[in-house]
Amino acid sequence: MKMKEPVTCNRSTCNSPQAITLSIGILFAPAITFRLNGTYWNKDQKYSGEYTISKEGKNLILHSSSGTQIVPDHFTLTPENDETTNFDLLNVMIGINFHWQRTEDQKFKGTLKIMDEGKHLTAINILPLEDYLLSVISSEMSATSSLELLKAHAVISRSWLIAQKIKSEKLTDTYQSCIQDEQQYIRWYDREDHEHFDVCADDHCQRYQGISKAYTPFVQQAIEATRGEVLVYDGEICDARFSKCCGGVTEYFENTWEPVNHPYLTKVIDSDTQSSTPDLSQEENARKWILSTPDVFCNTRDKAILSNVLNDYDQETQDFFRWQVSYSPSELSALITSRIGIDFGEIQSIEPVERGVSGRITRLRIQGSKRDMIIGKELVIRKAFSQSHLYSSAFIVETEKDTSEAITRFTLKGAGWGHGVGLCQIGAAVMSDKGYDYKQILSHYFPGTQLESIKNVNSSVSFAATSSINRGGAGKS
């Protein structure tokens, strides 16, 4: 039995959700242990049971209870029966570099591929798009979330994934992802960092934890009810993004990732009653906003709603809407050096240079006894100011001084959890609880978009039966 080749996605093959097959990077380690629950094939040899694969010299060695075997550096195991077989990956790291980082064993359907990437081995799962989505919306959120919220997330995740596959085919080196000299360190990250698979399984892309998470009837119903549906803007499938909590206002795409304008990833006030805010790119307005508690969807402490939208480890985070952290100058100096590799010496001042429309800092000036430098974008800032990742870059800085005017404490007071671009998961959960349907939720967070069946997205980027999403008063941008 030969390995099934994954189907690539382009304008001619992406017209059916069943035709799209994905490759997901799951585990990156010097050795990988897995358990095959059923019969799997590599060419004409079959495998079942528990194995460990490691690199010894230039060879990949497969270890089992019956002995060892040299295998190719692209070792693929294809299930004999897609419906009844699955495999376990042991000690998978999730939440990498975030405050919820931990390891767990995970179960997957589909094909398993082990690759030698030099510094480590990579375990890749290959499976159909709709099977992937079943796991994603259970992994990103609680599987007990409301049906309308799950439907909205299914559309977003499907749209984002297909947009990434199309983008990767067209991607050229038209922009830099890092600008660094003596005066600045500006960097942004995205999924094109992955060369040998479409997306990873962690928060860097979308959480994908296999079939380990509970599938409820609502999850399966959400996938079936939206099967093949994508968000479209101006004839293109949307690069739909999401974060946990926008903090009250969503952010521009280009303030977080590459300098590309997506009109549907814009400033949205997370409210059905508040139609405007002050210009949060201005420092004084941002300060007042961050120190306030505006009446917006994501400003909730309703435990029932939060338990329905957040997984167990996400619920360990309580103060996501407004939060604060505090450091001594020496603590902060050591933290920044360890996190981004730049030694500022004794930190003397922290000054926002540029903010986005949500109040998130995109460029931050740090003055120290050894150097004066600007860092950005938001993920670099969040990385620099936390052992994992700061909740968001929408923060103000307050300093405490002793009687000699020496700084004794830096306190960061912030808003939101995540980059704030696109759908706000907690805000969307509140909208669902208030009775908004998934079309209204999508319309609120992605203004100007249309909901379309992928089969109507053809090579000429025209649509057979495009209909606008009913905006339903779900909020204004």
Could you say what each language-model-derived stretch is?
Residues 1-477:
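Conserved, single-site charged/polar hotspot
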